[in-house]
Amino acid sequence: MKFIDEARIEVIAGDGGNGSASMRREKFVPFGGPDGGDGGRGGSVWAVADRNINTLIDYRFAKKHLARNGENGRGSDCYGAAGEDITLRLPVGTAIYDADTDEQIADLTLDGQRLCLARGGEGGWGNIHFKSSTNRAPRQKTDGKPGERRNLRLELKVLADVGLLGMPNAGKSTLITAISNARPKIADYPFTTLHPNLGVVRTGPSKSFVVADIPGLIEGAAEGAGLGHQFLRHLQRTRVLLHVVDLAPFDEGIDPVAEAKAIVGELKKYDAELYDKPRWLVLNKLDMVPEDEREARVKDFIKRFKWKGPVHRISALTHDGCPGLIHAIQDYLDTLRAEEEAAAAAPDARLDPTLHNVDHDGSANA
């Protein structure tokens, strides 16, 4: 299935049914009074996050989603039936924006998360509500209220622990194939990857993490060149970025350091928070470098790139260095999760009784 990560839709909730102005007409009941029922509520439009869906392609073509109107009220105290709700199933990781104001309405990050996109209109009142001691035969009724109507923009940001970042043909697809169950298209020309790929990396019976391989970036990606905006946003939810660098480009005129600096520059221009995200350097295609030149080439790259963070030397093609890389990632993610759990379990200082001079028996100290 083709990966679609943005769509625009219109959601229209159902209108409420009109109330009825009816009088009871029955044999032997000369003054039956009002018996007009209320109109039914209009159907609402809901969204629910579904982990079994991974693309917005259905909403690229089905742009208008309408819920049913409520039925009108009738005589004999018959209330109109409510309009049926409709539910739009969206991938986990979908952000929902108002297309007219660009305001974010919701971010569906949990499977089963549910949200009302457009609420149905309330049904109108029948004339039974207007009966009083001075108005025994009311003719008043109210019409149903219109349902909400919204233009929405759906934006999918993939949920992954690790994001692969790099120039086209840096070997990112080969790397995700080597370490995970993903099988993206691989070829010896740039821009082979045209949409994000997700792969699950298993490091033990109950340990795993998710890697996202986005299409290669080019200079100007932060301004949208090469669909850069669509690709960079998929890295925003990751915990760590792997900057994959081709250390043995076919074109000798290409400088890996200059390309790596260009990628970092695009990150900084696109989003400061993304730029500050933990980033590891992965020097790839070492199998293409003569063995006696590898150490010197690696040191030269690190020196000119002025890199002080973690460095991993690998060959995605031969899998050399890949086991060490994935176990280092798993250890890092485990440490992050342990710190988050410890922070969540820490007692709130505002609830510490010693700060308020309260004894354990509940009495206050002098």
Curated annotation (Swiss-Prot):
Q: What domain of life?
A: Bacteria
> What EC identifiers does the entry list?
3.6.5.-
Q: Does the keyword Signal apply?
A: no
User: Which Pfam families does UniProt cross-reference here?
Assistant: GTP1_OBG, MMR_HSR1
Give the UniProt subcellular location, in the record's own words: Cytoplasm
What GO molecular function annotation could you give as one example from this UniProt entry? GTPase activity
PROSITE patterns from the xrefs?
G_OBG, GTP1_OBG, OBG
Write out the residues that bind Mg(2+). Answer: S173, T193
Tell me the cofactors it needs: Mg(2+)
Where the protein is mainly located, per its record?
A: cytoplasm
Cite the entry's keywords alphabetically.
Cytoplasm, GTP-binding, Hydrolase, Magnesium, Metal-binding, Nucleotide-binding
Q: Where does GTP bind?
A: 166-173, 191-195, 213-216, 284-287, 315-317
List, for all copies, the residue spans of the domain called OBG-type G. 160-334
The cross-references to CDD domains, in alphabetical order and at most eight, read: Obg
What top-tier enzyme class does this entry carry?
Answer: hydrolase
Instruction: Look up the record and give one Gene Ontology term from the biological process aspect.
Output: ribosome biogenesis
Give the residue ranges for region: Disordered.
128-147, 344-366
Function per UniProt: An essential GTPase which binds GTP, GDP and possibly (p)ppGpp with moderate affinity, with high nucleotide exchange rates and a fairly low GTP hydrolysis rate. Plays a role in control of the cell cycle, stress response, ribosome biogenesis and in those bacteria that undergo differentiation, in morphogenesis control.
UniProt-listed NCBIfam families: Obg_CgtA, PRK12296.1, PRK12297.1, PRK12299.1
Q: How does it assemble?
A: Monomer.
Name the UniProt record assigns to this protein: GTPase Obg
Give the gene that encodes this protein.
obg
